[in-house]
Structures are given as C-alpha cells and as structure tokens.
C-alpha cells in the first residue's frame, strides 16, 4: 500500500440502532413480509444433537426499566464444542443440523426475548486452555452506538466456569456472576434465565471486541 498514510484516514462515524432497527434486521417483527425464510430465535432442527434448552431474559436500562425495542444475536458451538464454520479446524465432526447463530427482537410489550437452542460444549482456548460452555451475545438498541458484546455461561457448570480463561480475566469475582445464567426446569423444559443490565448496579460485563 505504498503512498498511503493511514494516519490521515478518519474514522467512519457511528450511529445508534435507531427506531427502525427491526425493519432492517427483523422485518417480520415489524409486520413486513420480505423473506421466504425469516430469521428467528430457533437454532435447532429435529435431528440436532445435544440437550435442548431455552435461553431467555430481559434487557434493563440504568433505571431498572426493561428495554422493549432491542435486537439480540447469539452464536455458539454445537454440543461437541465445534462452531459451524470452516474456520473451526479442531478435527471434530460438526453437527450439520445445528445453525449455531440466531437473531431475535424483544417483545414490544414486555421486553422479553428468548432463543430455542442446545447447550454448547466446551471449546478450546488459548495456550491449551479450555473455555467453559458459553454462548456469545450481542445487543443492538436505540441509543447504543456500537453493539454490546457479552457472554452467557451456565450456573450448573461451576467447575468449568472456575477454569475459564475469559471469566478469570475479569478482576472482580462478583462481576463474573453477571455473565452466569440461572437454570430452572419448567414443564419438563430446561430454561436458563439471563438478564442483561446496561448500566447501574450489577451492570453486565461487556467486552471490547
């Protein structure tokens, strides 16, 4: 790139998600039919391997009020700890019946959101470490310039969580708990509750990615 002085290049200005984020990214939720196959919160098929779970929660602002116009994406490994990507070169067989990625919007009335997925397996970390089962999550909403990245861990994986290099990189142990979803069983279904707090007391840990 001879002749280029990258110090002279200005950063492209960012914008918030705005009030029309659903029209662009989840048109069906805005009652606009565009796609034959709409994106949704279901990551599993009939033949998907692994334990079915539902991940659900709300997003709260600094005053403790639920946000009702947020959009959430998740991506995760399959039950064997393999991401459905050609870049994952662990040598393990990827589950062809698992999407590994989903997008949903919060309910306009209550702010609740949920995903139907499977509990992921542990994945390799740096320098031979192992990352505990987790789901990566990003939030888009009005008033947020850049999407907020966080992770969802599971409270019934305490031993694996204690060894996770990302959780251990968080200085205060009490802050790590903001990334741990609480398990319950409801009508025979395994549900993990994960509430996200944008600001204030018990603010969720977000990552600079």
UniProtKB/Swiss-Prot annotation:
Q: What pathway, per the record?
A: Aromatic compound metabolism; beta-ketoadipate pathway; 3-carboxy-cis,cis-muconate from 3,4-dihydroxybenzoate: step 1/1
Q: GO biological process: what's one of them?
A: beta-ketoadipate pathway
Q: Name one Pfam family in it.
A: Dioxygenase_C
User: What top-level class of enzyme does the UniProt entry assign?
Assistant: oxidoreductase
Q: Which UniProt keywords apply?
A: Aromatic hydrocarbons catabolism, Dioxygenase, Iron, Oxidoreductase
Q: What is its EC number?
A: 1.13.11.3
Q: How is the cofactor bound?
A: Binds Fe(3+) ion per subunit.
Report residues binding 3,4-dihydroxybenzoate: 142
Q: Name which cysteines form disulfide bonds.
A: none
Description of how the protein assembles with itself and partners = The enzyme is an oligomer of 12 copies of the alpha and beta chains.
Its function?
Answer: Plays an essential role in the utilization of numerous aromatic and hydroaromatic compounds via the beta-ketoadipate pathway.
Q: What is this protein called?
A: Protocatechuate 3,4-dioxygenase alpha chain
Q: Which organism is it from?
A: Acinetobacter baylyi (strain ATCC 33305 / BD413 / ADP1)
